[in-house]
């Protein structure tokens, strides 16, 4: 979906800012950009700040321990593959060119590590942060045990 198709799909109409400057009349800007992710509904804490970071995991790195963010986070995998798991959702692998998002708040983010054992993985993520809250808060073992029933079933290995 192009940016202009997304614009229309979300009822933004035809009026408003046309990008101005060179190329606006040709409409080239409407096809130059490709939508990678459309997440809704999102809740951004009032007075939130935003931070974009670049993360690079070496082969097999499990990533950040279970944690949560105070606001939503939106990511794009540059190279490699991220093992991604949010509370209540099955574990999945997001490959280079793919996106992920999480709502933030109370939801636990279990995994964000490198799914590859032989190559580096890199991604960028933009996180919204509620005022007075840390951008990332680790979840302790007691809370993980208390909320274990909210975690999606774990993948099982086939017998050898």
Task: Outline where the language-model segments fall.
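Short acidic-glycine-tyrosine-enriched beta hairpin
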Residues: 45-49, 56-58, 81, 86-106
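Short histidine-centered beta-strand/loop micro-motifs
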Residues: 64-69, 86, 93, 112-114
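N-terminal post-signal-peptidase region of extra-cytosolic proteins
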Residues: 58-61, 70, 107-112
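Short beta-strand/loop turn elements enriched in aromatics
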Residues: 43-44, 61-71
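A short, N-terminal "cap"/entry segment at the start of jelly-roll beta-barrel domains
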Residues: 1-51, 93, 137-160
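Ligand-binding loop in jelly-roll beta-barrel domains
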Residues: 90-91, 104-134
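Short, conserved beta-strand element in jelly-roll/cupin
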Residues: 56-58, 69-84, 123
